Amino acid sequence: MPGLHLDNCVARQVARLLTEAGYSVVTAAELGLQRAPDGRQLLEAAQQGRVFISHNANHFTSLHDAWHLWSRSWGVAALHAGILLIPHALPRVEARYITEIMASGWPLANELYRWRPRGGWVRHPTP
């Protein structure tokens, strides 16, 4: 099971709940990346083999698409452990969204999933 990297915008209480559920979790603050740009956050998660989790759907959808397009253009592997985009909710609800997909058996590597209130987890098509 891959570890998790929580973006600055995800509450620390979510990290605590996920840790209590048995996940290996790091936060941007723990890594000293609280002011790092989004691309740096995603790169750090990819280098550590951790699934990246954020509320910032627009930025990370664009980064995910660019990651795949540029990797294909440059002839390199587009490897990251996955990106999960969640809406703002109570920490216990956010943790439930995350544990649900982590336990689903769905492929996460190099994929982006977004939680939709009317449909649950939806895979973003790879460009």
Feature map (PLM): residue ranges:
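Short, mixed-charge, low-aromatic patches
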Residues: 1-2, 16-20, 53-59
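Acidic, PIN/NYN-like endoribonuclease modules and their adjacent C-terminal/linker elements
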Residues: 2-8, 12, 33, 39-42, ...
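Short, charged N-terminal beta->alpha structural module
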Residues: 10-20, 24
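Structured helix-beta-strand junction loops
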Residues: 21, 48, 80-81
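Conserved BB-loop
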Residues: 24-36
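Acidic, metal-binding active-site segment of PIN/NYN-like and related structure-specific nucleases
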Residues: 38, 44-46, 50-65
